[in-house]
């Protein structure tokens, strides 16, 4: 038995939320799975079936089960408008590289930035790159 936690973005705007649901199965790979899209703003109440299509599977570092990142399709198997992963895959290639930048400041006990003179206001963003 394998426990799969399906993870997808809902239809909330302007910023979607992460949604998930769990399926325990004997399948070796995560199967497609339907859900009620009316509760995630991805379908009207009259025709609310949506389909989760597995895109990538990862081992859950906390529990050892599987996390399944999913795209969303409508009940008629069209790409759902909230499925921005699909739109990105159409313009991206395997050649693309990207990175994330996280900035840190060392501070004095009083909260001022270490290395700046006391009483002098800090400069706008961008002038603190010391590496």
Located regions from the model:
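Glycine-rich, acidic/polar active-site loops that bind/position phosphate-bearing ligands
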Residues: 1-131
């Amino acid at each position: 038995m394998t426990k799969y936690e399906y993870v997808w973005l809902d239809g909330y705007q302007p910023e979607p939320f992460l949604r998930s649901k769990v399926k325990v199965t004997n399948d070796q790979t995560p199967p497609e799975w339907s859900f009620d899209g009316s509760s995630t703003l991805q379908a009207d109440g009259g025709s609310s079936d949506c389909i989760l299509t597995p895109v990538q599977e990862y081992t859950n570092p906390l529990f050892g089960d599987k996390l399944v990142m999913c795209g969303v399709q409508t009940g008629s198997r069209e790409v759902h408008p909230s499925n921005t992963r699909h739109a990105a895959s159409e313009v991206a290639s395997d050649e693309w590289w990207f990175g994330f930048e996280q900035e840190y400041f060392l501070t004095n006990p009083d909260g001022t930035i270490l290395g700046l003179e006391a009483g002098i206001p800090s400069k706008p963003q961008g002038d603190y790159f010391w590496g």
